[in-house]
Regions:
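Active-site-adjacent pocket-lining segments in enzyme domains
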Residues: 4-103
């Protein structure tokens, strides 16, 4: 599940006992009690058992992880570009525009 789509997994209860990352605004996470903040990790991509979640900008890393999970041999060089390994937490926290009042 990539970008904001983990919200659907949360609504279905799938994330209740799994760690995950998601491209969701902090305000959205606060608004919806079904999103288990305690399981949210600040990583661009995260794998917990058979579930892979990623932020939208980590689509390359997500594709490589999914390919490997289904048994396709895939090197880190399979796709062009640079993989950034270390992110600061503040780089992975998103807020809505303050001019937008209603979620």
């Amino acid at each position: 599940s990539i970008s904001s789509s983990p919200i659907l997994l949360a609504k279905a209860g799938i994330l209740d006992d799994r760690k995950f990352c998601a491209g969701l605004y902090e305000e959205v996470i606060d608004k919806y009690e079904f999103i288990p903040r305690k399981n949210l990790v600040r990583k661009p991509i995260y794998e917990d058992r058979n579930l892979i979640t990623a932020l939208g900008f980590a689509y390359r890393e997500f594709a490589i992880s999914v390919a490997r999970k289904v048994g396709i041999q895939c090197s880190n060089e399979e796709f062009k570009g640079i993989i950034k390994e270390d992110y600061k937490d503040e780089e992975l926290i998103f807020h809505t525009n303050m001019d937008y009042k209603e979620l």
